[in-house]
Curated annotation (Swiss-Prot):
Enzyme Commission designation: 3.5.1.103
One Pfam family named in its UniProt record: PIG-L
Protein name (record): 1D-myo-inositol 2-acetamido-2-deoxy-alpha-D-glucopyranoside deacetylase 1
Alphabetical GO biological process terms: mycothiol biosynthetic process
Length: 323
């Protein structure tokens, strides 16, 4: 995958009324977040015939640029990185087999806020500064159109404390609440109550195994190996993890999706790194914490299906429409 591409950034036009029995909505902060934490999940459900919708809240304008010949596009220079990241996202969606992708409020409605405490937090249209209900209203339109039984977003800390991730969490949770409220914006469509809500998770035990694997791998082309989980800004207590999706059959889709982001992700043999150069192991399994709905465990104690317990194998909808 090279840094230049001819893919069209607008992406395919999403269907107005999905007819798939299973409908999954994911809300992420920036292009590349979706493939790193949920790529195998998205590919798996898309391949199985579920309607998968991705809503990305910003175009990642403040991201660092790992491709030297594109460094001039960075926010502190020409400020045109969004042009590339939108195209990278379109290519990643092709790799994952996902046709329905939207930007919250449309491309450019909200800007990447940068890391916490930086001047980018206060730029015009920074997502971190967005009015919560106004931003949530954009997502309510999507929820009532798609009628997802399952919603995936981040935990209260946004996974690792990035302001856009925290805001994505707030907007997603507020939108789920408002979409079920008959008094809120009836012009946005019939009321819909999402049956199950998950937050992405990375069990501390799995992180520890990945750190050890990187150490044992030796030279990994400049990737930094941290000493312990405590050195990372993220990680979920294993006791909070309720669900795991086995993405083994879709790892190549996930890898190809990650290769679609040359400006953001450095790829290695079995490992990858972002701009901080900290090596992370490719994960065949992706993990979640169920925060709304009832978990349906297995002999391992973890759910194996985001739609478990919803009774939609026969094609009946499990969400609640009140319109």
């Amino acid at each position: 995958m090279t840094a230049t591409t001819t893919a069209q950034p607008s992406g395919p036009v999403p269907p107005a009324s999905p007819t798939a029995a299973r409908r999954l909505l994911l809300v992420h902060a920036h292009p590349d977040d979706e493939v790193i934490t949920t790529g195998a999940t998205m590919a798996a459900y898309a391949a199985e015939g579920a309607h998968v919708t991705l809503v990305t809240c910003t175009a990642g304008e403040e991201g660092e640029v790992l491709v030297p010949e594109l460094a001039h596009l960075a926010a502190d220079r020409e400020d045109r990185l969004a042009e590339i990241r939108v195209v990278e996202l379109a290519n990643a969606m092709t790799a994952l087999g996902v046709a329905d992708h939207r930007f919250l409020g449309g491309v450019g409605c909200y800007r990447d806020s940068g890391m916490m405490g930086t001047p980018a937090n206060d730029k015009p249209h920074a997502f971190w500064r967005a009015d919560l209900d106004e931003a949530a209203a954009h997502l309510v339109k999507v929820v009532r159109e798609i009628r997802p039984q399952v919603l995936v977003t981040y935990d209260e800390n946004g996974g690792y404390g990035h302001p856009d991730h925290i805001q994505a969490h707030r907007v997603a949770m507020r939108a789920a609440e408002l979409a079920a409220d008959p008094a809120f914006a009836p012009e946005h469509g019939a009321v819909w109550d999402v049956a199950k809500i998950y937050w992405t998770a990375m069990p501390e035990s799995v992180l520890a195994e990945g750190i050890q694997a990187l150490k044992e791998a030796g030279d990994t082309s400049g990737f930094i190996a941290v000493e312990s989980v405590e050195d990372l800004s993220f990680g979920t207590d294993d006791a909070l993890v309720t669900t795991t999706i086995d993405g083994t059959a879709y790892m190549e889709n996930k890898r190809e999706g990650m290769r679609a982001y040359p400006t953001q992700i450095s790829m290695g043999q079995g490992f990858f790194a972002l701009s901080n150069s900290i090596g992370m192991e490719f994960m065949a399994h992706e993990f979640y914490q169920l925060v709304k709905g009832a978990a349906e465990g297995s002999d391992t104690g973890l759910e194996k299906d985001l739609f478990a317990g919803l009774g939609i194998a026969d094609g009946t909808a499990a969400g609640v429409s009140q319109g």
